[in-house]
From Swiss-Prot:
It is a multi-pass membrane protein. The keyword Iron-sulfur does not apply. GO terms for cellular component: plasma membrane. The chain crosses the membrane at residues 10-28, 35-57, 72-91. Keywords: Cell membrane, Membrane, Transmembrane, Transmembrane helix. It is found in: Cell membrane. This is Uncharacterized protein AF_1598. The lineage of its organism: Archaea, Methanobacteriati, Methanobacteriota, Archaeoglobi, Archaeoglobales.
Amino acid sequence: MVTKRSLLKLYLLGIVTLGIYFIYWLVMVKRELNSLGANIPTCWLLIIPIANIYWLYKFAEGFVKVLKPGESAVLYFLLFWLVSIIMPAIVQSELNKLAERGG
């Protein structure tokens, strides 16, 4: 089940909690993507240096597999890594579209 979330609320809570809400959001989105068929590893890899780069690649790969089939996982990985502030907006927008369709 995909949850529709407000982008404004996502960013405001992320700023107010100094980024802690973004980590919580990543955990919740990872669960949703995995329930839709992605294969994203445990979020504990987020706190391990170097392993967090691998985790972000696997997240981008799962995002593309579930929500953007036919597009490049490497492109989304680079986008998420280099311009990470827009990553929640891209991912949540796609999840919101899926939630509106009833996915």
